[in-house]
Amino acid sequence: MSKLRWNEVCVLWNGEAFDCGTRLCCKTAYAGLILNLSRDGGSGEEPPSRDALFWKRLKEELPELDLKAREVLRNAFPGENIAALPLTELALDQDESYGVFALGYDTGETLAGRLYLFVPFDEGFQLCGEPICELC
């Protein structure tokens, strides 16, 4: 199966590419909100490290992966209303702690900045690691 260029990934996800620093980004609708897909560096013409089957599977299994990630977050943060957190990020090729990809949830503004919780997944779409807290 061939690798898709970033603009082809955006078409597959019915999204729109945009610049976000050193990352390639694409915004698309998911669950009535905006989901940002992003991957590290390169250019939109350079194929991502994943093939078309990966992207199609990711799109098809996203609702199930979202449920798995929320369960991890519920266990890690038992006092929080995880169901209310919007899934806003799907990050790929970030670094090893983020697995092959990670789902990111926007918890809102804090005194230190906007806080996101990321849940990493491996090549087999299995959970792989602890949640990651990231301030932006």
Locate the predicted segments by residue.
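N-terminal leader/targeting segments
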Residues: 1-33, 37-41
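Acidic, proline/glycine-rich low-complexity IDRs
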Residues: 1-17, 94-136
